[in-house]
Amino acid sequence: MEDLGENTTVLSSLRSLNNFISQRMEGTSGLDVSTSASGSLQKQYEYHMQLEERAEQIRSKSYLIQVEREKMQMELSHKRARVELERAASTNARNYEREVDRNQELLARIRQLQECEATAEEKMREQLERHRLCKQNLDAVSQQLREQEDSLASAREMISSLKGRVSELQLSAMDQKVQVKRLESEKQELKEQLELQQRKWQEANQKIQELQASQDERAEHEQKIKDLEQKLCLQEQDAAVVKSMKSELMRMPRMERELKRLHEENTHLREMKETNGLLTEELEGLQRKLSRQEKMQEALVDLELEKEKLLAKLQSWENLDQTMGLNLRTPEDLSRFVVELQQRELTLKEKNNSITSSARGLEKVQQQLQDEVRQANAQLLEERKKRETHEALARRLQKRNALLTKERDGMRAILGSYDSELTQTEYSTQLTQRLWEAEDMVQKVHAHSSEMEAQLSQALEELGVQKQRADTLEMELKMLKAQTSSAESSFSFCKEEVDALRLKVEELEGERSRLEQEKQVLEMQMEKLTLQGDYNQSRTKVLHMSLNPISMARQRQHEDHDRLQEECERLRGLVHALERGGPIPADLEAASSLPSSKEVAELRKQVESAELKNQRLKEVFQTKIQEFRKVCYTLTGYQIDVTTESQYRLTSRYAEHQTDCLIFKATGPSGSKMQLLETEFSRSVPELIELHLLQQDSIPAFLSALTIELFSRQTSI
């Protein structure tokens, strides 16, 4: 806009100059008409030439001014371009530094986030461990609550039974008071005492004892009445007996005659019995002789069979001697041949031992070679990784060198354009200073490129060294493989025995692992039974209160579980926010606060106290269970062991052998039914099983009958 304004001012001045010249020419022409034509024309021509010269000078000056202004504008544009380039370079440098700082900050932030993530994971583990401990404590508390509920239920049952008994005693007292009018005053006192009995248990117990005494007196009176009735019945029976005796006395002579006849028959029968006894003795003797003869016949048949077997064996030995040519005529020859075979077996065993020792040595050598091969493979992998990293570094350096060369060429082109646009004389001091700075920058770029080239050459040299090292390692690996193949071919002849031994070792290890698993299962079952308390659920009634502590504890556990889940979700959101690198939300900043050391110490103390409490409870449970088992063994006479899940082994204390046992299996819902499994001992008592289990369907009767039978066997022995 300034250039256009200056051009318009120059044109307006030229136009005004031409107008002035034309006016002067008209004025001079009007004034000098009378002069001569030649003089006026000469003057006009000179004046016109002067005016043209002045106009030409003005035009040249304006053109010079315009050229100078264009030059200044070009210089300003060049300066502006240089300033913009310098500014862009400085901004690029600042951006590069800012990016480097930002990368460092991001790396530091990533480290912090990783540390925060590790702390969050550790905190989550601690929370999970705390949750597990709380769950264990809750299980223990629930177990205690169950025990307390059982005790409360038993207490309530006792209270209800006492109340029922009190009501019965009240009814009996009312009946006695109605029947006995003379005890009405005592009835009033008893009513007052019964009303007070509901409030005070001690007075109620005293009144119950008094009522029990009165009931005992009543029972004694009833017993006396029953005794009198029995005596009356006996007297009536005696009267009937007296009547019958009288009738029998009337029949006494006839009875005496019959008695004589019976005596005679008795003597005859005794004689017949004696003769019959003699005949039976003779018959038994003959039967014994017959049995001995039969046994002798059987023994003779057995001897003949054995003789035939021995003859067949002798014939087979003779045939073996003829076929093999061993010359075994006598037992001494056979024993000598057996001794020779044993000696051969010993020599073969020694050879086998030497072969196995050599095989073990070769296995050790093979193991060492395999270790060396693994080490060589690991070194080869490391060298390959290093080579890849060096190749990547070389590629990056080449790319960086190409970029630097492009920047250098660009700077040179810019400087060349500046040099072509401006003449040598028009350089200013600022331009020379910029040129020197550009030359210094070019020298620095040259130095940096030379350093990069040196690093590239060094990396290429290291890459060549690494390749040579990798080639040597591959050659060593091939040599080691060849050595291992030769070693394998050298001890392939004893590989079958080694495989057989390995199979035996694997079988033994499998059996050991199986036994360990069974042991763990049994220990878990024992712990489960100890924790459960070993009570019969079919006979034990569990009462739940309206304000049940276990339900409240479960509700608290559910609330704690929900709270922990929310905390885990907040922690996950915090971890995701930290991984993204963005700002942490305000709702997650509270979740990132870690507990103090005091809280951690208190929690650890609580955990230790809870663990100690659980350990003490376990010890108490174990001692109580042992006492309970001993008491059951002494009272019932049976030792109860858990073999597997829902199977129980009963061993009687009067058993003749330790292996004599019964195995019951719990079936039905919650083990309400028991089923007897077949064992060798159960096969020996089929009558008891048929009577008590199949017909009567009573396991206690079967066990008691079995105990009596075993006890009678031991006492009879």
From Swiss-Prot:
UniProt keyword annotations, A-Z: Acetylation, Cell cycle, Cell division, Centromere, Chromosome, Coiled coil, Cytoplasm, Cytoskeleton, Isopeptide bond, Kinetochore, Mitosis, Nucleus, Phosphoprotein, Ubl conjugation
Question: Where N6-acetyllysine occurs along the chain?
Answer: K61
What is the top-level taxon of the source organism? Answer: Eukaryota
Q: Where in the cell is it found?
A: Nucleus; Chromosome, Centromere, Kinetochore; Nucleus envelope; Cytoplasm, Cytoskeleton, Microtubule organizing center, Centrosome
GO biological process terms, semicolon-separated: cell division; mitotic spindle assembly checkpoint signaling; negative regulation of T cell proliferation; positive regulation of mitotic cell cycle spindle assembly checkpoint; regulation of metaphase plate congression; regulation of mitotic cell cycle phase transition; thymus development
Where's the Glycyl lysine isopeptide (Lys-Gly) (interchain with G-Cter in SUMO2) crosslink?
K61
Q: Does the keyword Phosphoprotein apply?
A: yes
Question: Which PANTHER family does the UniProt entry name for this protein?
Answer: MITOTIC SPINDLE ASSEMBLY CHECKPOINT PROTEIN MAD1, MITOTIC SPINDLE ASSEMBLY CHECKPOINT PROTEIN MAD1 MITOTIC ARREST DEFICIENT-LIKE PROTEIN 1
What is the designated name of this protein?
Mitotic spindle assembly checkpoint protein MAD1
